Amino acid sequence: MKKVLSFIIALAMAVLICAPSFAADTVTEKLYNVYGDGMLFQQNEEAVFAGTGKQGRRVEAILIDSTGRVAARGASVVGADGVFKTSFKAPAGGYEEYTVELRSNGYLFEKLENVVFGELWLSGGQSNMQIELRHSVTGRQMLADGTRGSKNVRYFYSAPNPVYKGSADNLPFEPQTEIEGCCWFDGTDDRIFNISGVGYFFAEKLQKELDMPVGLLSGSLGGSCIAAWIPRETVESDKNVKKAIGSAYISEKNWKEDGSLSVLSDCTGLYNKKIAPLTNFRPAGMVWYQGESDTGRDYGRYTTLFNALQDSYTRLFNHKNGDLPVVISALCDFSFGGLDGMKKMTAEFAEMQQLRPDSRAVVSVSDIPLTYYVETQTCHPAEKQPVGERMAYAAQGLVYGADNCVSAPSMKSSEIKDGSVYITFNYVGDTLKVKGDRICGFTICGKDGVYVPAEAEIVSKDTVRVYSDNVKKPKAAMYASGLITQRCNLFAYKNGEFVWPVLPTVTDWEYIDNIVTDFGWTDCDTSEIWRQESLTLAGYYDVWESDGAQVQVSPEAAYKGAGGLAVKGAADSFSVSPVTTYFDEENNKNIFQEFKQDWQNYKKMSVMVRNNGSEAVTLSNIKIYKENGKWVSPVLDGKLKTSAVIPADGEWHKLTFNLNTLMFSGKTTPAAASRTYLDNVADVEFCFEGANADLSMDEISFETTGIASPVIKLLGFDPVSLLFNLVTTIIGLIKMA
């Protein structure tokens, strides 16, 4: 009997001892994989834990501080759908590291170590956000010298290029709950070199400025359109959004499994895969660098879609204090969407920001060097640190109340008065200020809608006057509209420092068809300028070249501005030309440097010339080349000849040529109404004759037709110029006879 009793007692004790492990073996609850050791939750918000389990089980989340004390807890029950979601109120942010235990019916099934609370942000966009830290200038230096980031910055990494293959299995129709291959780590981990360079510098800078742990959720993919990041229910509930998305919308019926889906552009695909799984986080805001893939579309389309994206993310992340704040990066210089596509998009960003100034900021990037690495192509500038740090600067003003410029300067209002366009800007800091001798980057147009380079002056701390002698009755002005805008030099200025450049600006979107890009050579202020139209080749190139002469940019040769062109003839006949092409060896072809311009809408071309020598010099002609090598020369205004004598008087002379009356390849008979021969200008050559010539050239400018552009477009020519040139030609031929 004693033996039996002893056996029963021993068996009971064994059962009691082993019961937890037996029970634990039957626990099926698990967290979604977006949670992990070393993670960060937004302070003072609900810290939500979600996953799957058996219906009816009680799931508890317990927060344990560094002393072992329970700091917070919350519980819920697994629902009929097999999903649980439990939460507790997150404590104030700080550097204390916590443990979170997840228990099912009292049994531990998950433990998260080294959890902190602070400021959590989401990063999103396409390739310029995705480009990894290791492909940035600073990142490469960090790799070389062993530098790492802060342990107080926590990164949620998700592989930017998972294997989608365009199938419904890999690009699901429904929002997902997990992200393949995701993980959390801090800034001291070697894996930081795989995260977004812009995101890294944003988070590191924000952490230092706030003196608070910062977390960053990653969500970007190169080449992606904005439509891919918007949830389906948002699209289907708003006909304007659905119309703006157009063919990128795909219904469930047509969500094919044959590999034809586009990861980059089809509506909701990337949202389902990379954003929806983050729904239980509570980010304080988002940094966004996207838009290149959406250039070349109608004005206003992107605004419609971005409004939808911001509204849907505000709901998704349960942001309670107005809209989810978003800091947007302007687009870098490149020819996506045409020569002016990127600048039109950034100009729309600027106007979009003013629709919701309390929740949006735009940072400008036009002054940041366009250094690049061949393996990441020229459209991905490698200087990511200034971009990320400017986003952190904007976030401090937008979200955290710092006395910063909240956004880069953008147009507040404009007024046409006394032959000038007056533009008033927001967010100028203490004042607008120019870097250099004069403001570069403004253009102006009349009723013909054709823009020409303009003069500009700051008339008050936030207002600029824009004008041109060649446009007497302006209709609109633009700023930083060209392909390469690094010469644009108007800045917000605060506390004795240049903060960032003014954003691309359009005063009237009705006048947007004939934008002139910054040729770089017309003001003769600089000897080198950055050029890029190739994905693999870009850099600083000479602005001018010569044949039979020495040429250099010199302040002593300036008529206006920082410099002019000093020309020393080495032969009796010589020429100077702007450099318009460079050779792309990889593709074995010439690349035109933001050139190949349509000059049909220009009526006159002028150049300032000074003869510093002792003998007269003749500008024999200006040769304007087409790509096929054929050339024409404009006649001197009011004359039937292409040449002009420059007297040796040491004075500046303005030589004006009529672009509507041209001599063909040296012939002496002019042709009337020949504007169509200027539809694709590939090169320009200024040809001179004179021994021991010593010239200064500066300020090459253009005058437009002045005829409303719809008339010219309809007829294909300028009727006023046609009549004038016919009369001039007849009179000239009579005199020649």
Role assignments for model-derived ranges:
Residues 12, 252, 704, 734-737:
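Short, flexible helical or helix-coil boundary motifs
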